[in-house]
Curated annotation (Swiss-Prot):
This is Gamma-glutamyl phosphate reductase. It comes from Alkalilimnicola ehrlichii (strain ATCC BAA-1101 / DSM 17681 / MLHE-1). Belongs to the gamma-glutamyl phosphate reductase family. Keywords: Amino-acid biosynthesis, Cytoplasm, NADP, Oxidoreductase, Proline biosynthesis. Its EC number is 1.2.1.41. GO terms for molecular function: glutamate-5-semialdehyde dehydrogenase activity; NADP binding.
Amino acid sequence: MTEDIRAYMQTLGRQAREAAREMARADTGHKNAALHAMADALEEHAGDLKRANADDLENGRANNLDPALLDRLELNDERIHGMAEGLRQIAALPDPVGAIRDLAFRPSGIQVGRMRVPLGVIGIIYESRPNVTADAAALCLKSGNAAILRGGSEARHSNAAIAACVRAGLKRAGLPGEAVQVVETTDRAAVGELIRMDEYVDVLVPRGGKGLIERITAEATVPVIKHLDGICHVYIDDSADPAKAISVAYNAKTQRLGTCNTMETLLVAEAIAERVLPELARRYRESEVELRGCEATRRLIPDAVPATKEDWSTEYLDAIVSIRIVPGLDEAIEHIARHSSGHTESILTEDWSRARRFLREVDSSSVMVNASTRFADGFEYGLGAEIGISTDKLHARGPVGLEGLTTEKFIVLGDGHIRE
């Protein structure tokens, strides 16, 4: 069986590599036509998608899948239309492929510049949400790449139905159907093969729980674009506008609880703590957020649960917030350096010199001033859809959109130039 899986995955890899060469040559018009055709196919086959999805939902209920996962798994008319519109929006985005920058003459007379080109073959491993099949395929195609998609077994039928629409759209536009391939087996050995296919796969993007991403990172020989945790911080400086600070800190925690850009730890300068924490605590309680605090915090909020050492390094993804009162900016930056996952941090301040220092010294993929961490999102950043968020420093960092799925090569223009 292992040999069969290896042979199957090698076939997918070879087909993807061949398709990637064709996609790299495809012009913007053909890629956009494919995206529109894919969107049309999703809406035309909405009935087929819902029937396939019903099988997945039935299996999920039989296997006692968590209600939240069942909700993510469900496809209805609204979500199918949303997927289709997402593809059309990606078609409307600028095509990064072929863009040339920094073209300049050198003393030798040659011109040297950089051209943006596709990465090649992208392996995407994800869980639960079948819409990722369409989103990931579209981003890979618009950026001139081929994709091998391995979704969760709980969405097997839905993913296959969406992939059929994607391939139909590619073929309508005259592009290779093998540019997007879905791993059809549920055997986990297929993932083990995919993450080690260096000869065919250029980069992996895992999307899912921490356990999945840790496994991929530990076992892959192919480079990985990923983030493990979203331990995001908001620091309220003593120069902050109290009303503004309360509003932002409340939004950063409560606007949506289970996302990687939700604030998990609130740091407050001791000089402003009495002016913001009682009101902020009241608002958190109204939203049924559990408060965990240091000793100084609990003197202002007596019903707060004592925070443990582990709380400062925990991504709750739940209605829980840790609060620590610190002497000032130095201690806030030090706390973030020790406990942050490198995702997103924000300072609330009216002192621009402190804001600039925070921007310069905090080493995370997104650093903000007077804004909610919930803005750390490809759409909000003007990137359009994103394939994920990277907290690594190589190759991409922060929300990864179309440009993050490309790289650069040097181009040199001459006219018979030789090196003396």
